[in-house]
Amino acid sequence: MFKNNLRFTSWINQHKFYQLDLSLKTRSIKQIVLTLVFKTLVLGFFGLIVIFPFYLMVVVSFASDERALDTRTPILWPDSWNFDNFSRVLSDGKYLNAIVVNTLVTVLSVLLTLFFTICMGYSFSLRKWKYKKLVWFFFLSVLILPESALLIGQYRIVIVANWNNPNSPLIVLGLIMPFVSSVFSGFMYRTSFEAIPSQLKESALIDGCNGFNYFLKIALPMVKSTSWTVGILTAFSAWNSYLWPLLLLGNRVDLNINLWVLQQGILDANSSDEQIRTLLNLKMSAAILAILPMFIIYFLFHKRIMNAIKNRANTIKG
């Protein structure tokens, strides 16, 4: 009798555990399916928000002038593929010159930013020097100010240095003024240099390596990922700048690609009462030509760009 009761109790327990395990499996499958559906919907929604403007830009760039002027009907698909729109915006002959100047400004901004921020970050990573904390606090206080608040001081410097003449080669120095240094980039380099073990520097000094050789041959290669991050972010910032070139160049659209895009597709009014009309198909064609170099750079260095964004996010969190 006791054995039968024991067997019956064991069977009941096994049956309960089987039902419990089955319910957990069923619940986990439901959670996985619901989570997958939720992630798909959320990612699809935000992906649509990001991709749709690019899709609209490409579609409108091939539209005819009649459809571009008709603001009542949205252009979701072109009635014809008008590649002539691209040749029309290139006919003014200013695109190539704007691309060359923009590239020169971007390259110089990246090189000078790397030089100044590396020196800044390394100097603040050193352990002791007089008034280090006070000077660092002063630099960090600049981060509180918005970039637009610094334009007045930067513009004043450019005026005093006579770098604001669009007909002079010195205008390039004026255009790179806001991008040659960055406190945030210096902060990134300081964090990276401080992460290098102090024992490594001590071993290098014992082996006869002086301070400059340690910085050049050991410390600098170890912050290569930070250099890629700073370089990529500076390049995008300098290439996409609009307010500062507008302030310096005015109507010289041949010296900045964004100003060139802004002037495309504008129709002169036939009378004083008529509003100025804009051909969006030409403006979108110009926008595609303007972002084409950055798209090429992105596809060549997309892995490093994503790592740069990730490193910047980790720096902000840290």
Swiss-Prot record:
One cellular component term from this protein's GO annotations in UniProt: plasma membrane
Membrane-spanning parts: 42-62, 98-118, 134-154, 169-189, 230-250, 282-302
Record-annotated ABC transmembrane type-1 domain positions: 99-301
Highest taxon in the source lineage: Bacteria
Biological processes, Gene Ontology terms: transmembrane transport
Subcellular location(s) of the protein: Cell membrane
The entry's keywords: Cell membrane, Membrane, Transmembrane, Transmembrane helix, Transport
Knockout-associated phenotype: Probably essential, it was not disrupted in a global transposon mutagenesis study.
Keyword Chloroplast among record annotations: no
Principal subcellular localisation of the protein: membrane
Record membrane topology: Multi-pass membrane protein
Function: Probably part of a binding-protein-dependent transport system. Probably responsible for the translocation of the substrate across the membrane.
Family: Belongs to the binding-protein-dependent transport system permease family. MalFG subfamily.
Protein name in the entry: Probable ABC transporter permease protein MG189
